[in-house]
Structure formats: C-alpha cells, structure tokens
Amino acid sequence: MEDNLARAVEIAKELERRNATNRMKFYNPYPYQQKFHNADAQQRLLMAGNRVGKSFSGAMEMAYHATGKYPNWWKGRKFTQPIRAWVGGVSNETTRDVCQKELVGQPDDPSAKGTGSIPLVDIKETIRKPGVFFFF
C-alpha cells in the first residue's frame, strides 16, 4: 500500500514538473490576446490594464516564433525557418525580471529553467552574463 502511495506521489510530481516546463501546451489566450496574436501587421501594440497578461502574451508569441511550434488557432505571422531574435526591456532589471522570467523562468533559480513560455525541451543552453541572458 505504501509503495503504491509513494509511486502515485512520484507520478503526480513528475506530471506537475512536465506541466510547469511546458506552459506553451496550456496557453489559452483571452479574446483580446488572440486578436493581438492574429493581427497581420508588421507593428502591433497590446495595450491593457496592469497584470492582465501583456508580458506573457508577448513571451508566448516569441516562444512560438523561436520554436516554430504554432497552435492550431494561430492566424498571425508564421516563420517557416529558424529565426534569430532579440528581446529586451528598458533596463537590465526589467529585462531580467520581466522578459527573462516570462521566456525561460525565474532568473535567480536555475531549477526554474523552462518554466516560462519556452518549453524546457526547446532550451538547449542558457548563459548568464552581467546584464544579459542568452538562451539557445
């Protein structure tokens, strides 16, 4: 009985880890986010209130472009070949605390790599540099 319970706990933890490191699989945008993603324009603006998902929407879009894994509902621009892209913020702090966190996970926690919008299986390597963070 204890072995079964321990095994069930082990399986539950592994499922939780897999879900946490593949947020792309579970992204279900709100209508305003989907409208933004599907807009076919060279320049777009997502303007909304505080803490409603603007940064994560942008991170998800970057993750789709960086990985080439577009969801079925996607009507926006699709890249058919690998891309090189830069993501930045107005300061080192916002780049680290917002952009990096939303893309690859909590910057000060190496075990959180892959808990952002880019799935862990798609992150080959990360390199920490003062003021800059690279991922491949």
Task: For every predicted segment, state its role.
Residues 1-136:
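Phosphate/NTP-binding elements of NTP-utilizing enzymes
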